[in-house]
Amino acid sequence: MPLSASLPSKNYDYDYDSVQPYFYFEEEEENFYLAAQQRGSELQPPAPSEDIWKKFELLPTPPLSPSRRSSLAAASCFPSTADQLEMVTELLGGDMVNQSFICDPDDESFVKSIIIQDCMWSGFSAAAKLEKVVSEKLATYQASRREGGPAAASRPGPPPSGPPPPPAGPAASAGLYLHDLGAAAADCIDPSVVFPYPLSERAPRAAPPGANPAALLGVDTPPTTSSDSEEEQEEDEEIDVVTLAEANESESSTESSTEASEEHCKPHHSPLVLKRCHVNIHQHNYAAPPSTKVEYPAAKRLKLDSGRVLKQISNNRKCSSPRTSDSEENDKRRTHNVLERQRRNELKLSFFALRDQIPEVANNEKAPKVVILKKATEYVLSIQSDEHRLIAEKEQLRRRREQLKHKLEQLRNSRE
């Protein structure tokens, strides 16, 4: 059910009921959705549980806001300044709303359902559906703008109020209306608490309880700062698949009359540009074996390639050296084994020779090395004692010889 923002609704009690969305989409949009699913050449076939979403397409409805016109109906018969400003805002706000949002509320809910399905099930088909829906809505909106442009320019503004009534009645009614409006706004429920996602950017922020009621009418709209616009652009670059770039600046003046404000408050429209942002969607196949390949940017890839080339060169240089080193190690091992075998053989032969020199174990071929060493030690000690004894005997014999020589000389001299 499209929302008509160009004509103001006089019955404000039922105005909020009229904007409640239907539970299901219109037949036309469902046919488009089914047709988009049946075309399987360019789009991915739907997920097995994609049709279940039709049962869950009801939007959460917040409780109705309190009436804003109950006390004003019997208070005054003439529109006050606040009423006139609100009517002008509604008349001029339609173009701004249609300019900033291509789809009407039902179409917005349809697009959001596609986005929800994109997040949960089919990533490729939902992107193409969303792109087609936005393109069609853009074409219809531009056609309606071209047809309705001259008519909107020639349409006169709301009739100015008649001669000023006595100051007591309108002032009292305006003050009463502002008071009721402030109380109603304080009693309203913030839609962000009820809705899981923001419906649109035109939803006003919740006013603090002590705010001025005149500021709640939305007479002046402060321009968005550069930081907010940069944050919105960053969010759009990160999330959106189709982005609408538009530059519109609207300035409203409350000091002039209603006709002058209508002439000055017409926004300067710029042509809408439909940007197609390519989003890389990688679906991970959990059944496939894990791949160790990692993709890097161009600069990092060049660095890695150069590093790999250097590593390959160094590896090529080292390719021959491991072989030579292995051969050298094998040669060293062979020579070491040969030398060790020779040493053991020599040691065995020396033990055999030592065993042959010891009389106690000379005939024992199975004598262990420890026994051979012990017997050899004992034999060496005995030989040393024999040596000392023989040396002492030799010394005695030498002295005896000297004595005998001396006696022989004495005998020779005595005979002469």
UniProtKB/Swiss-Prot annotation:
Example of a GO MF term: protein dimerization activity
Feature: compositional bias, Acidic residues: 228-240
Record field: compositional bias (Pro residues): 156-169
Domain bHLH span(s) in chain numbering: 331-383
Keyword annotations: DNA-binding, Host nucleus, Oncogene
UniProt keyword annotation of DNA-binding present: yes
SUPFAM superfamilies associated with the record: HLH, helix-loop-helix DNA-binding domain
Region of interest: Disordered: 144-174, 203-268, 315-340
Cellular location(s): Host nucleus
Low complexity bias (residue ranges): 212-227, 245-259
InterPro entries listed in its UniProt record: bHLH_dom, HLH_DNA-bd_sf, Myc-LZ, Myc_transcription_factors, Tscrpt_reg_Myc, Tscrpt_reg_Myc_N
Main location: host cell
One Gene Ontology cellular component: host cell nucleus
Ranges of Polar residues composition bias in the record: 315-324
Region of interest (Leucine-zipper), residue spans: 390-411
Subunit relationships: Efficient DNA binding requires dimerization with another bHLH protein.
Annotated function: Transforms avian and murine macrophages and fibroblasts as well as murine B-lymphoid cells.
Further remark: This protein is synthesized as a Gag-vMyc chimeric protein. The sequence shown here corresponds to the Myc homolog fragment of the chimera.
Entry protein name: Viral myc transforming protein
